[in-house]
């Protein structure tokens, strides 16, 4: 027998009573975006559960995609069969004989939404249970925590049988918590920060600073590849490339070396905040981890934050590097992140950056520059690209080819 659909059980949105349908509609939209790589698959949702119709598509590939989508608590692949007792008996016997192993226990859980069906739920439980005993006489029934819980649902159009319950990603559907601007470098931390923001329902737009010719086309391609990895959790992501060469050259020329990183980050924060304002974002998200590098001390964060009143979310701020790497490997961004392309934060990195910069000093150095003009020109020059989910490709090999 071949699976015909996958039944979706919702996650935390079950607690969002007043906004429930808004959350469900957003989840449906996200599933459609992520599953768009399977042209024959369709999605339907109602108040209690969702349904992914396979229409001949390989179940295992679709299931792997569903495991990543936030807002799904669990899902079950289902067999669609004709709605009569004889057909149900044969289907249940075939399924049970294929999955049963010595010593396993079972339970039949029948449910009717079509009350015109000839047997009620209790009678159907008994009939199908007897059918299992007739082909597996040594099997034992167990009502609490059986090894196999065979669920039979009688709907208006057909009957559906399932026995697997696969854990989903949980969290909230992406987009239900508003929009945030992710400051995406090419490193390990910022994609992980983006992933964790997505899990809490934030619709992220990736802001990436490029400084050609100091940063290469390969660095930009790397940032695109990292963004594409994040699309599998909720669908399309807007990638915003910011021209940053003029600003970095200006900072290099007019500020002391120890303050290069602080001033660079302050400009990045200003620009990201301006983009957020123009694109109706609510927060800024970055991959800062406390004490990991010179620009991530509390004093540095304070000096950098001083340029905006917008909330800054730092999902990995308390994590050790190994904890961040574990998540990066889980979400398949690590091997891309470690490819050796320089980004804006490394090309002019000073040997001894200031770890406790003073706000008054940074402001004094910025008076040597046309801060507003530099920010305006950078924002005016942004390029926005829609990054879409796609079938698995070897992004790492592509990046290595660029290096060679």
UniProtKB/Swiss-Prot annotation:
Q: Please report the stretch or stretches of sequence annotated as the THUMP domain.
A: 60-165
Question: What biological-process terms (Gene Ontology) are attached?
Answer: thiamine biosynthetic process; thiamine diphosphate biosynthetic process; thiazole biosynthetic process; tRNA 4-thiouridine biosynthesis
CDD domains reported for this sequence? PPase_ThiI, THUMP_ThiI
Record's PROSITE patterns?
THUMP
Q: Which reaction does it catalyse?
A: [ThiI sulfur-carrier protein]-S-sulfanyl-L-cysteine + a uridine in tRNA + 2 reduced [2Fe-2S]-[ferredoxin] + ATP + H(+) = [ThiI sulfur-carrier protein]-L-cysteine + a 4-thiouridine in tRNA + 2 oxidized [2Fe-2S]-[ferredoxin] + AMP + diphosphate; [ThiS sulfur-carrier protein]-C-terminal Gly-Gly-AMP + S-sulfanyl-L-cysteinyl-[cysteine desulfurase] + AH2 = [ThiS sulfur-carrier protein]-C-terminal-Gly-aminoethanethioate + L-cysteinyl-[cysteine desulfurase] + A + AMP + 2 H(+)
Q: Which SUPFAM superfamilies match?
A: Adenine nucleotide alpha hydrolases-like (SSF52402), THUMP domain-like (SSF143437)
Give compartment(s): Cytoplasm
Give the EC number.
2.8.1.4
| Keyword list, A-Z | ATP-binding, Cytoplasm, Nucleotide-binding, RNA-binding, Thiamine biosynthesis, Transferase, tRNA-binding
Question: Could you say which residues bind ATP here?
Answer: 183-184, 208-209, 265, 287, 296
Q: Which GO terms describe its cellular component?
A: cytosol
Classification via InterPro entries = Rossmann-like_a/b/a_fold (IPR014729), ThiI_AANH (IPR020536), ThiI_fer (IPR054173), ThiI_N (IPR049961), THUMP_dom (IPR004114), THUMP_ThiI (IPR049962), tRNA_STrfase (IPR003720), tRNA_sulfurtransferase_ThiI (IPR050102)
The keyword tRNA-binding is annotated on this UniProt entry? yes
Q: What is its main location?
A: cytoplasm
Q: In which pathway does it act?
A: Cofactor biosynthesis; thiamine diphosphate biosynthesis
Q: Can the keyword Nucleotide-binding be found in this entry's annotation?
A: yes
**GO molecular function annotations of the record:** ATP binding; CCA tRNA nucleotidyltransferase activity; tRNA binding; tRNA-uracil-4 sulfurtransferase activity
NCBIfam families the UniProt entry points to: tRNA uracil 4-sulfurtransferase ThiI
Annotated family: Belongs to the ThiI family.
Describe its function: Catalyzes the ATP-dependent transfer of a sulfur to tRNA to produce 4-thiouridine in position 8 of tRNAs, which functions as a near-UV photosensor. Also catalyzes the transfer of sulfur to the sulfur carrier protein ThiS, forming ThiS-thiocarboxylate. This is a step in the synthesis of thiazole, in the thiamine biosynthesis pathway. The sulfur is donated as persulfide by IscS.
Record's protein name: Probable tRNA sulfurtransferase
What organism is this sequence from?
Streptococcus agalactiae serotype Ia (strain ATCC 27591 / A909 / CDC SS700)
């Amino acid at each position: 027998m071949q699976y015909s659909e996958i039944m979706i059980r919702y996650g935390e949105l079950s607690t969002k009573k007043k906004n429930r349908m808004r959350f469900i509609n957003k989840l449906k939209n996200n599933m459609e975006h992520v599953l768009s790589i399977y042209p024959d698959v369709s999605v339907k949702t109602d108040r209690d559960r969702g349904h992914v119709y396979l229409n001949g598509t390989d179940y295992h590939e679709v299931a792997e995609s569903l495991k990543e989508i936030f807002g799904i608590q669990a899902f079950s692949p289902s067999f669609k069969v004709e709605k009569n007792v004889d057909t149900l008996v044969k289907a249940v016997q075939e399924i049970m004989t294929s999955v049963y192993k010595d010593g396993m226990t079972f339970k039949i859980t029948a449910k009717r939404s079509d009350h015109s069906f000839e047997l009620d739920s209790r009678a159907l439980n008994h009939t199908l249970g007897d059918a299992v005993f007739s082909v597996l006489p040594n099997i034992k029934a167990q009502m609490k925590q059986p090894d196999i819980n065979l669920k039979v649902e009688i709907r208006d159009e057909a009957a559906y049988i399932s026995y697997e319950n696969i854990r989903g990603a949980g969290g909230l559907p992406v987009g239900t918590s508003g929009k945030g601007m992710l400051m995406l470098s090419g490193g390990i931390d910022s994609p992980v920060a983006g992933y964790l923001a997505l899990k809490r329902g934030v619709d992220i737009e990736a802001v990436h600073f490029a400084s050609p010719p100091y940063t290469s086309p390969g660095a930009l391609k790397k940032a695109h590849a990292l963004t594409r990895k994040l699309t599998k959790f909720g669908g399309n992501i807007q990638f915003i490339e910011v021209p940053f060469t003029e600003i970095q050259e200006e900072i290099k020329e007019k500020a002391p070396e120890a303050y290069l990183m602080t001033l660079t980050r302050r400009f990045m924060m200003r620009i990201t905040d301006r983009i957020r304002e123009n694109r109706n974002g609510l927060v800024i998200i970055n991959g800062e981890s406390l004490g990991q590098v010179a620009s991530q001390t509390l004093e540095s964060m304070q000096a950098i934050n001083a340029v905006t009143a917008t909330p800054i979310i730092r999902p990995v701020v308390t994590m050790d590097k190994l904890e961040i790497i574990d998540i990066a490997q889980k979400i398949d961004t690590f091997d891309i992140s470690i490819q050796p392309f320089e980004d804006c934060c490394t090309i002019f990195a000073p040997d001894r950056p200031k770890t406790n910069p003073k706000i008054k000093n940074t402001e004094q150095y910025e008076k040597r520059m046309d801060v507003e003009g530099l920010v305006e020109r950078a924002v005016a020059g942004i390029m926005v690209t829609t990054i879409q989910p796609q079938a698995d490709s070897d992004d790492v090999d592509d990046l290595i080819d660029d290096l060679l």
